[in-house]
């Protein structure tokens, strides 16, 4: 932490005539560049997003990578002009176009997809899709619990709303947004809810001993007690203490109301409870089931006009390639589940669709679509015509988005992290498992 005094020159010497104005800024380098921009804004009325700060001594541009402790005190402020904004927008548009596959590469991908579909016919299991249905439909009961007004009120009472709202507004102000729209405020609050949840929920590899608080090891499964079954814990893991040999129970609760109390678990409990929180604050939210070994959340962003990925275990948002590119996961089925039905959203999370197709062997693609449509139709049957039309229009827009997503180029310059949640031992075990993540079905509970 270093206290600095900068002299910021504004105007003059730029061909526009007039004397340069000088402003002195007292600044603590610990606070970061965003705070410096806000201080300059208070003196010059140039919004942070339109500021270009240049070191007068060498002409270098001050950015997030600049060592603010080492530069000279003389700074020059240049307001970005409309022409520069247009140039930046044009460059961004060109970069977006460059992301799309070349015609030749796209043709290769489509051919590989057709070949994968052909081979899939010889690999799929001929059970009429019953296994697939059994892995998806039970989760509808799970997500419908999120709609209980009493549960939602209990959830809201556990959240420091005033604190998160303040943090949301501060985050917007740091971006130069001092008069945010409702959609912008809602979006910022959602991100603060994610960050808060990440800090307030506890990951469990092996629970501490109930008797002495020391480390335990798994010794198998136990029979659920009536008090545990009441809150959906059909599976109970049993652990023995390394020191006092006492046993500790770890019920895998499914009722999000109970998770408000326990505030612990693995990815199943984390995603279950966080999706419930999102619904409790009025966000359109879906539980996302990855058939390999993970669960997370999606919320519909009115700000972006699309569904947005959020992973409470990792504290990550809007980064759907995290699993394939960062974790090196071999995805097969990624299914979104909400009160309004179920959707296959696998294409959002892959840029290797033809490879994913080769692993989708539970049933045919037509059967997958038919089962999902059947489940969705069942849970939308009571909707009004207007409500149904709105959902169908949103589904259509999402289908178009997903169709394009699988053929977009991966930005190789972006490095995504591997999995952070869970111990190394647990992560290794998890990679060997492909069970149902929440304990509403049978399985050994890798998730």
Swiss-Prot record:
Give an example GO cellular component term for this record. cytosol
Gene3D superfamilies tied to this protein = 2.20.25.10, 3.10.620.30
Q: Name one GO biological process term.
A: response to ozone
What cofactor is needed?
Zn(2+)
User: Which compartment or compartments is the protein found in?
Assistant: Cytoplasm
Q: Name one Pfam family in it.
A: Transglut_core
> Which family, according to UniProt?
Belongs to the transglutaminase-like superfamily. PNGase family.
Q: Which reaction does it catalyse?
A: Hydrolysis of an N(4)-(acetyl-beta-D-glucosaminyl)asparagine residue in which the glucosamine residue may be further glycosylated, to yield a (substituted) N-acetyl-beta-D-glucosaminylamine and a peptide containing an aspartate residue
Q: One MF term from GO for this chain?
A: metal ion binding
Origin superkingdom: Eukaryota
Q: Which InterPro entries match?
A: Papain-like_cys_pep_sf, PNGase, Transglutaminase-like
Annotated EC: 3.5.1.52
Report the principal subcellular site: cytoplasm
Which positions are annotated as binding Zn(2+)? 209, 212, 241, 244
Which SMART domains does the record cross-reference, listed alphabetically? TGc (SM00460)
**Organism in which the protein naturally occurs:** Oryza sativa subsp. japonica (Rice)
Name of the molecule in the record:
Peptide-N(4)-(N-acetyl-beta-glucosaminyl)asparagine amidase
The job of this chain, per UniProt, is described as: Specifically deglycosylates the denatured form of N-linked glycoproteins in the cytoplasm and assists their proteasome-mediated degradation. Cleaves the beta-aspartyl-glucosamine (GlcNAc) of the glycan and the amide side chain of Asn, converting Asn to Asp. Prefers proteins containing high-mannose over those bearing complex type oligosaccharides. Can recognize misfolded proteins in the endoplasmic reticulum that are exported to the cytosol to be destroyed and deglycosylate them, while it has no activity toward native proteins.
Q: Which top-level enzyme class is recorded in the Swiss-Prot or TrEMBL entry? A: hydrolase
* Active site positions, chain numbering: 267, 294, 311
Q: How is the cofactor bound?
A: Binds 1 zinc ion per subunit.
